[in-house]
């Protein structure tokens, strides 16, 4: 049986998108919230560099290029291994000395922010920042080194075998059954009373908040195997991390394009 080459290409493309778009939703939510909180000047510049609403469309670009040898160096930019029982002073030390534990997430954000400040039309740096600020607010991107941020922790998710990291990368978000635009609007409405407070927070406070949730994830009572209980227990924390990510990304870009 012959299959039209163009139809086959479209089918394969659809399969690829369905496999990759799952984790893209969270990054698009963060990017959309950020876009809605940019200053007029920052929004104009971001649109100039990435195209109108390009900040949302390019939010997962940094994940997509990881398999390209050209960007192999960026693989370790997506995470920052943190030990248990770290204090605020410990975290601040790592942020102030971003190469102390290797060239990981803190290093990447520090380097890319400086790079974009130097050349405000650097599309590559901007796309990395959009994505990595999102990673900064996914608690298990600052997980334990020995379990690779939960990637080596088996998890049964409504009858499907997966891992703890994947649950937080996408499964919890997918469970909401909302598009990125619906979810981002829901979060902006939900946290409108706290927006002014969150806008005052710096990177350190964002990391501390994500680290606190990370510790909650690791200390969760695994004898309770109900996924419904898990979803309910972490619902507000998931929402808060996504919203904080969007506001912090807006803060970063507003400061660069002031």
Label each region the model flagged.
Residues 1-8:
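Bacterial N-terminal signal peptides that target proteins for export
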Residues 140-141:
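Transmembrane alpha-helix/helix-exit interface in multi-pass inner-membrane proteins
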Residues 16-18:
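N-terminal signal peptide c-region/cleavage motif recognized by signal peptidases
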Residues 1, 20-22:
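Absolute protein N-terminus
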């Amino acid at each position: 049986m012959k299959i039209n080459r163009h139809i086959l290409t479209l089918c394969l493309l659809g399969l690829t998108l369905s496999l990759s778009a799952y984790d893209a939703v969270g990054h698009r939510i963060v990017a959309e919230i950020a876009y809605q909180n940019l200053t007029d000047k920052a929004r104009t510049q971001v649109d100039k560099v990435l195209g109108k609403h390009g900040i949302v469309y390019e939010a997962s670009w940094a994940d997509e290029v990881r398999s390209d040898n050209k960007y192999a160096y960026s693989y370790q930019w997506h995470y920052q291994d943190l030990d248990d029982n770290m204090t605020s002073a410990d975290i601040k030390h790592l942020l102030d000395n971003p190469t102390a534990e290797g060239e990981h997430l803190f290093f990447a954000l520090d380097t890319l922010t400086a790079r974009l400040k130097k050349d405000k039309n650097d599309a590559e740096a901007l796309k990395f920042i959009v994505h990595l600020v999102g990673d900064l607010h996914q608690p298990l991107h600052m997980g334990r080194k020995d379990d690779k941020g939960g990637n080596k922790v088996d998890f049964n998710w409504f009858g499907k075998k997966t891992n703890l990291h994947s649950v937080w990368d996408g499964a919890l978000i997918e469970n909401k059954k909302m598009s990125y635009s619906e979810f981002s609007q829901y979060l902006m409405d939900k946290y409108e009373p706290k927006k002014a407070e969150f806008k005052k927070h710096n990177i350190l406070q964002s990391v501390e908040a994500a680290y606190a949730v990370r510790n909650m994830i690791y200390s969760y009572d695994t004898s309770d195997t109900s996924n419904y209980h898990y979803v309910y227990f972490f619902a507000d924390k998931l929402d808060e991390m996504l919203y904080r990510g969007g506001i912090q990304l807006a803060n970063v870009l507003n400061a660069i394009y002031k």
